[in-house]
Amino acid sequence: MAYRILFIDEQKKYQNNFLDYVEQKNIEDVEAIVKYPESSIDDMINVVYEELADAVVTDFRLNEYKTDIKYNIDYDGADLLHSLRERRKGFPCFILTSYDGDAVEESQDVNVVYDKSVINPYTEKSERVSFLEKIIKQIDHYRKTIDNAEKELCDLIEKRSKEEASLEDEERLIELDNLLESSVDRRGEIPAEFKKLSNQSRLSELIKKADEIISKYETIS
């Protein structure tokens, strides 16, 4: 299965660095896509969806240089990471920066922040696991989480249709449904109060919605 990695930077030279870096690593089925940041964060997130990206690598200070773009960017890489993960829980995102302290503080996660030198194919430090391999590992982990949730959800739906589900099963079904919806786009998530399984019509709606989410996810995998 291919890995589509979207790289976002306002400077063409770093876009080229990333393309060269991925090419040099020569890992099978990795496709690098480079984009300039959109002026608004919502437009940028739409690009992520349109490109069917499996992971996003973004510069931290997206509005710092105006050599290749002439418009203003009203967000930084940490803002983009937070917005993506609000919509897709656990989605693989990484920030590259020359300003480690600021990026770590704003992202609130030291594990997603890397020095920009990691994508320079001529200066990358020798590491047991390369930056690109770490990205792929996170994509695999995210996909496995979704796959496992899909399988468990289908099992619970079948169990509930046979009237064999316990209260704990019903609660877990709702939890899994939330996870799958958020993995596609949390803006489409059903409010928790609607998901109270107090009658058969609500259960039927939940099952229908779960099937739609699984189908939607399969079309973008």
Residue ranges of each PLM-predicted region?
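Acidic, metal-coordinating helix/loop segments flanking the phosphotransfer/catalytic sites
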Residues: K35-A55, N63
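Receiver (REC) domain switch-region micro-motif
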Residues: V56-T58, L84
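C-terminal output/effector regions of signal-responsive regulators
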Residues: D140-S221
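Short, electropositive alpha-helical surface patch
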Residues: E105-S126
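The C-terminal output helix
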Residues: N120-C154
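Conserved acidic segment of CheY-like receiver
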Residues: A2-N26
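Short, flexible/disordered intra-domain loops and linkers
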Residues: E64-D76
